[in-house]
């Protein structure tokens, strides 16, 4: 359906759009087109003001029960009013008087076309809309937004490009068309921080109706923003909660969903029209209970995120609207054009608020000489930080490929530079405490991080990025370092320039950048299991198709060998992490074992019961040879003897030299097999 968003329904960005109440005199002076804009108010008014309302008589005047208290009465007959009183906002007949709003309430019945609304109906919708605070104007003040969504505090002032009137119109037209939408925009235009808020607003106003051409029944469903990591769920939900004028979750339109969520982060009074911030895995468990689906960080190609895209595309009639958000389409545009049915592409132009300077530091060593390349890189990094130093009280981020490199580079830098050094990555538990130190320090802070800081945490005093240009790509029983893609470069560079001018220092040749096909280095069992659950046809229905389909079919055969029913698999998918697919054999044995194994997957606490159960699976690994690494570490070169990757070589670190065999407990725990 082609619909333009009238100006009066813009979301208040508190820059050039403000919450506003229109007077009847203003309405009288409007053009017909401007007056007709108020016809769309019937949808939010029906949902949020007239639902379960009735006619009452208050001091002799017919009103809606949401306007005044009074005894429920039968409605009067309505013809053309004899007189209009703009001051009291009443229509006067010879036998009775009725409020503008009550007149509209009685006239706006199911199947009425909104283009048939006359001036009398529109005046009543104006009054009802004023009471709901759903209108906006280019004049006003921030405090006028208090109460719009039940908020005690005003909306934030947002000058970002995604909330300009032009962007709001474009996003609304795409949303109401029910076409899949691919939304891109430079870092800093407000994709993740503002677009979900805008879609929440549209959902509050118009969500749940099958058409905006006539009055119909509605089915209210929330919006969901699906994200790859818990840190992002917490970060973005808190940002939007505050920007909508709330200080607590309860009673707000914001809810969170992720595994083992603490009690204080559960909204006990959620709104039916609200927005749920969820990890990808939990999004999949109730995907069709949401009206608008937003998938963020699409360029990361998180496995479950890609599966959600495939499921939503297969069952697109069960979702009102789908938005895919990504910083860049460099790697995915052509695939999305083919994969999605008639997609709409929206780009929000704009850069970061402040200028970002780029500096290239050349590494004279070829990357094929890995150790020499890294040693030269570390020397270059010290020189670069000395030449391009964050101001006192500010910070810089060093992007390296892995957790091990975080420690290696921190140790190297601490010996050569007089600055405060910190490490942040996904397994660091006290990130908030570290950031407090960074923000309160009068000194220069250098943060060494994995790609985690590309998006998971915004550091407000960062002025410099030092990018090594690499990422560790995990693979079954191993992984490798790769040079980053353009989208990853854009994300890293965009960490600065938001609050102050920034500097992006990069240490890699741009010709080394390449697209990363993550599915070719992943365990594929989730693709099989979710395909079974949602009736996907493999491989055609997958967003990204594996290069080697033999592995996909071998994975399917391996899963079939477990002899677990599809119904049971679906329950396991909804309730457990199953970081190793073989754990499924244990989850189905007994509820007590399932509870302990689940606790192990969540907390790392390995009880003797769980240990013995996993050992009984005989996840055997053969040790081929080993070499001494340092004082308490030996590198073992091994071969996997089970599963889809039987015969694959693996490297395992252990605190003493081993021979023979070991059993795998998890991806980090191995138990030597007793040779006796």
From Swiss-Prot:
<keyword id="KW-0547">Nucleotide-binding</keyword>
<dbReference type="InterPro" id="IPR027417">
    <property type="entry name" value="P-loop_NTPase"/>
</dbReference>
<dbReference type="Pfam" id="PF00270">
    <property type="entry name" value="DEAD"/>
</dbReference>
<dbReference type="InterPro" id="IPR002464">
    <property type="entry name" value="DNA/RNA_helicase_DEAH_CS"/>
</dbReference>
<comment type="similarity">
    <text>Belongs to the DEAD box helicase family. DEAH subfamily.</text>
</comment>
<comment type="function">
    <text>NTP-dependent helicase that catalyzes unidirectional unwinding of 3'tailed duplex RNAs and plays an important role during transcription of early mRNAs, presumably by preventing R-loop formation behind the elongating RNA polymerase. Might also play a role in the export of newly synthesized mRNA chains out of the core into the cytoplasm. Required for replication and propagation of viral particles.</text>
</comment>
<dbReference type="GO" id="GO:0003724">
    <property type="term" value="F:RNA helicase activity"/>
</dbReference>
<dbReference type="InterPro" id="IPR011545">
    <property type="entry name" value="DEAD/DEAH_box_helicase_dom"/>
</dbReference>
<feature type="domain" description="Helicase ATP-binding">
    <location>
        <begin position="172"/>
        <end position="347"/>
    </location>
</feature>
<keyword id="KW-0347">Helicase</keyword>
<dbReference type="InterPro" id="IPR001650">
    <property type="entry name" value="Helicase_C-like"/>
</dbReference>
<keyword id="KW-0946">Virion</keyword>
<dbReference type="InterPro" id="IPR014001">
    <property type="entry name" value="Helicase_ATP-bd"/>
</dbReference>
<dbReference type="GO" id="GO:0044423">
    <property type="term" value="C:virion component"/>
</dbReference>
<dbReference type="Pfam" id="PF00271">
    <property type="entry name" value="Helicase_C"/>
</dbReference>
<keyword id="KW-0244">Early protein</keyword>
<comment type="subunit">
    <text>Monomer.</text>
</comment>
<dbReference type="InterPro" id="IPR021892">
    <property type="entry name" value="NPH-II"/>
</dbReference>
<keyword id="KW-0378">Hydrolase</keyword>
<feature type="domain" description="Helicase C-terminal">
    <location>
        <begin position="366"/>
        <end position="535"/>
    </location>
</feature>
<dbReference type="GO" id="GO:0003723">
    <property type="term" value="F:RNA binding"/>
</dbReference>
<protein>
    <recommendedName>
        <fullName>RNA helicase NPH-II</fullName>
        <ecNumber>3.6.4.13</ecNumber>
    </recommendedName>
</protein>
<keyword id="KW-0067">ATP-binding</keyword>
<dbReference type="GO" id="GO:0016887">
    <property type="term" value="F:ATP hydrolysis activity"/>
</dbReference>
<feature type="binding site">
    <location>
        <begin position="185"/>
        <end position="192"/>
    </location>
    <ligand>
        <name>ATP</name>
    </ligand>
</feature>
<dbReference type="GO" id="GO:0005524">
    <property type="term" value="F:ATP binding"/>
</dbReference>
<keyword id="KW-0804">Transcription</keyword>
<feature type="short sequence motif" description="DEXH box">
    <location>
        <begin position="296"/>
        <end position="299"/>
    </location>
</feature>
<keyword id="KW-0426">Late protein</keyword>
<dbReference type="Pfam" id="PF12011">
    <property type="entry name" value="NPH-II"/>
</dbReference>
